[in-house]
From Swiss-Prot:
SUPFAM superfamilies: Nucleotide-diphospho-sugar transferases
GO MF term set: GTP binding; metal ion binding; molybdenum cofactor guanylyltransferase activity
Organism per entry: Acinetobacter baumannii (strain ACICU)
Protein name, UniProt field: Molybdenum cofactor guanylyltransferase
Binding residues for GTP: 13-15, 26, 54, 74, 104
Subunit annotation: Monomer.
Length: 209
């Protein structure tokens, strides 16, 4: 089926240490009823070709939830953040475009892949486009071209792991989205997860009254 943009793979970034989650794997947590893995898969499976998880653990659990999921680890041991996951992805994916998404997002905009491709096309030099929700830049929620690999490698070699600075070198474009009543666009700790669930429960009670 012609989607109006080039073949694009999806990589879910789940390679962090989860220190603020007491070691819990965020991709296997339920923010909205389903596990994050299932939620992300269901939302984006029709928009992408292959789906990968960048993670160092729980492969068998991922595959029990989504049997055709593919997995890979960072090229280097240790925890170097999303930049290393993005760099490592290009050794595995076959597509020349990859949508990266953090494992802890709460909101996945409709038509996000198409809109990121549209943003990317606005500048011929651009090798990246990222999502902004309600004015907040979500740099790990982004679309990269394969040509970005050289810059990713250079930044890692220099131990310059900031996505924001790297994206400046990639002439990154932005796809802007708005979402009312979005209190957390991502969950970074157990405290935030508890707050998110409490707010969600309150909204559900309020909406039924």
């Amino acid at each position: 089926m012609n989607k109006g943009y080039p073949i694009t793979d999806l990589v879910i970034l789940a390679g962090g240490q989860a220190r603020r989650m007491n070691g819990l794997n965020k991709l296997l947590q339920q923010f909205d009823g389903d596990t994050q893995l299932l939620k992300i898969h269901q939302k984006l499976k029709s928009s992408v070709s292959e789906i990968w998880v960048n993670s160092h653990r729980d492969y068998s659990i991922y595959q029990s939830i989504v049997p055709d999921i593919k997995c890979f680890q960072d090229d280097a041991s240790g925890f170097f953040g999303p930049l290393m996951g993005m760099k490592s992805a290009w050794s595995h994916v076959r597509a020349d475009y990859v949508l990266f998404i953090p494992c802890d997002v709460t909101y996945i905009p409709t038509q996000v892949v198409a809109k990121l491709h549209s943003a990317l096309r606005k500048n011929k030099q651009a090798q990246a486009a990222y999502v902004s929700i309600n004015g907040d830049a979500l740099y790990p929620f982004c679309l990269l071209k394969r040509e970005s690999l050289e810059v990713l490698e250079q930044q890692i070699d220099k131990q310059q792991l900031s996505l924001k600075n790297c994206f400046k070198l990639l002439h990154a474009q932005v796809a802007i989205f708005q979402k009312q009543n979005l209190f957390f666009h991502s969950i970074n700790s157990l405290d935030e997860l508890q707050q998110y669930k409490q707010i969600k429960a309150f909204k559900e009670i309020f909406s039924t009254n």
